[in-house]
C-alpha cells in the first residue's frame, strides 16, 4: 500500500508542521548567511504514516549571494535539527517531534513548462482547429 492516500491525521499534522516551519523561517533566526535575508516558501509538508518524518517541500523565492536553489535546500537540511528544536515549542502536543527533511518543490517549474506548452503556436492551432470541428 505504498500509494495509499495520507490519513486525515497526517494531513492535519503536516499542516501544523508547515505553519511552524514557515514561522521559524519568517523570523530569520537561522545564523546562516545564505538563509538570513532570504524569503523561503514552505509549500507542503508530507508526514510519514508514523508521523516521525516530515518532508518539507520548499521554494526559495529569492536567492542571494548567487546561490542556487539546491544550495538553499542543503543549508536548510544542515540546520534541520535546530529548526526541529524551535518548532517543538509550538508543537508540544506531539508525542514525537518529527525529523525534518527539506526538498525542493518543483511544482511551479512544472506549471511554467505546461503553461508554455499550452501557449505554443502548435497547440493553439490544434485547439482552434478542434473548436471549428466541434461547431
UniProtKB/Swiss-Prot annotation:
<comment type="similarity">
    <text>Belongs to the RbfA family.</text>
</comment>
<dbReference type="InterPro" id="IPR000238">
    <property type="entry name" value="RbfA"/>
</dbReference>
<keyword id="KW-0690">Ribosome biogenesis</keyword>
<dbReference type="GO" id="GO:0030490">
    <property type="term" value="P:maturation of SSU-rRNA"/>
</dbReference>
<comment type="subunit">
    <text>Monomer. Binds 30S ribosomal subunits, but not 50S ribosomal subunits or 70S ribosomes.</text>
</comment>
<keyword id="KW-0963">Cytoplasm</keyword>
<dbReference type="InterPro" id="IPR015946">
    <property type="entry name" value="KH_dom-like_a/b"/>
</dbReference>
<dbReference type="GO" id="GO:0043024">
    <property type="term" value="F:ribosomal small subunit binding"/>
</dbReference>
<dbReference type="InterPro" id="IPR023799">
    <property type="entry name" value="RbfA_dom_sf"/>
</dbReference>
<protein>
    <recommendedName>
        <fullName>Ribosome-binding factor A</fullName>
    </recommendedName>
</protein>
<dbReference type="InterPro" id="IPR020053">
    <property type="entry name" value="Ribosome-bd_factorA_CS"/>
</dbReference>
<dbReference type="Pfam" id="PF02033">
    <property type="entry name" value="RBFA"/>
</dbReference>
<dbReference type="GO" id="GO:0005829">
    <property type="term" value="C:cytosol"/>
</dbReference>
<comment type="function">
    <text>One of several proteins that assist in the late maturation steps of the functional core of the 30S ribosomal subunit. Associates with free 30S ribosomal subunits (but not with 30S subunits that are part of 70S ribosomes or polysomes). Required for efficient processing of 16S rRNA. May interact with the 5'-terminal helix region of 16S rRNA.</text>
</comment>
Amino acid at each position: 500500500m505504498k500509494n495509499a492516500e495520507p490519513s486525515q491525521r497526517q494531513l492535519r499534522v503536516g499542516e501544523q508542521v508547515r505553519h511552524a516551519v514557515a514561522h521559524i523561517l519568517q523570523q530569520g533566526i537561522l545564523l546562516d548567511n545564505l538563509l538570513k535575508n532570504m524569503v523561503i516558501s514552505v509549500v507542503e509538508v508530507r508526514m510519514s504514516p508514523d508521523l516521525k518524518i516530515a518532508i518539507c517541500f520548499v521554494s526559495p523565492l529569492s536567492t542571494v549571494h548567487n546561490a542556487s536553489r539546491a544550495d538553499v535546500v542543503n543549508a536548510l537540511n544542515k540546520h534541520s535539527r535546530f529548526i526541529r528544536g524551535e518548532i517543538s515549542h509550538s508543537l508540544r502536543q506531539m508525542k514525537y517531534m518529527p525529523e525534518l527533511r527539506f526538498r525542493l518543490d518543483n511544482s511551479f517549474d512544472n506549471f511554467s513548462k505546461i503553461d508554455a506548452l499550452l501557449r505554443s503556436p502548435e497547440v493553439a492551432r490544434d485547439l482552434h482547429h478542434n473548436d471549428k470541428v466541434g461547431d
